[in-house]
Amino acid sequence: EEGSLLSGMRAITLRDSLAEAIIYHLSRDKSLIAYGEECRDWGGAFGVYRGFSDIIPINRLFNSPISEAAIVSTAIGYAISGGRAIIELMYSDFIGRAGDEIFNQLAKWQAMSAGELNLPIVLRASIGSKYGAQHSQDWTSLLTHIPGLSIVYPATPYDAKGLMASSLCSNDPTVFFESQRLYDKVEIFTENGVPKNYYKVPFGKAVKRRSGKDITILTIGASLYAALDASIELINHNIDTEIIDARSLVPFDYEMLLNSVKLTGRLLIVSEAVERGSFANTIATNVSKFAFKNLKASPMIIGAPNWIAPGADMEKTYSPQSEDILDLVFRDFFPEKRINKRGLRKDWDFLDLAKKGL
């Protein structure tokens, strides 16, 4: 009697949002097949397809051998024969096991056929957490380096459903990254939560998560939530943060980012990929070129350190946390506002580290 009313938001998880978009297409497009390791028996590595085996026949939802090369290459053959496929690699770390198939076949056959061949393939790849060196790497930047692929990385249930719908409508190959840490996240940004109805989120459109006037923080994937936590602390020091969620890496929404940077004059990019060779560096370089006159400071990036991912007990020292964002913002953008030694952490010789590839 004394409790408050439950929220009216439809609070389904990111996992369930993916499932809604996929089952919509599977039930309507008989040419669409879905497969990967344990996709039928277990619903996939992380349960996105759970319950699908009661609806979708075994010839359209099935288990594959433990061979990433076979998973990708058979999808390519099926697609160029007129089919459509959504395939799952259990961890993005295993992209290397299908290197030629992704880099030289999936990405290139449309161009090599002068547009005669379509490759309507969605490659789902999860970014691991808590599983150490070989199962916890963010390889988004590796894929953005390959021309011919669309790359998306949703951080919210609403975007996961909408971007998956767009991916399954595309005739181009799409790599769809998913963070294992976000599978159980519910929607907190969209009024009324994730719609029951079908909808699409377009590629190449970022979204503003928070408006501010002092600094722009661009987030890629799961780093959105660390940035949101940092923004709460920053406002206590009169630093008003604008947060933009990239959502789509290829194509990328430079218009929204540049409009924000022209207002704030400062840019920090946060990604969980290692900093060396990160796509965040490409974005920072382009912003320096396109908005040079508007910048009050050089764009900065925060990523994972340039070394091997540690085990679960050390993971918070590896992927960027809100404290790392605060340290950099106070140290490099607002040194006059730092307090309690915030911004003085990591008193290293950064030039020496760069020379050593660290």
Ranges and model annotations:
Residues 1-177, 180-358:
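Thiamine diphosphate
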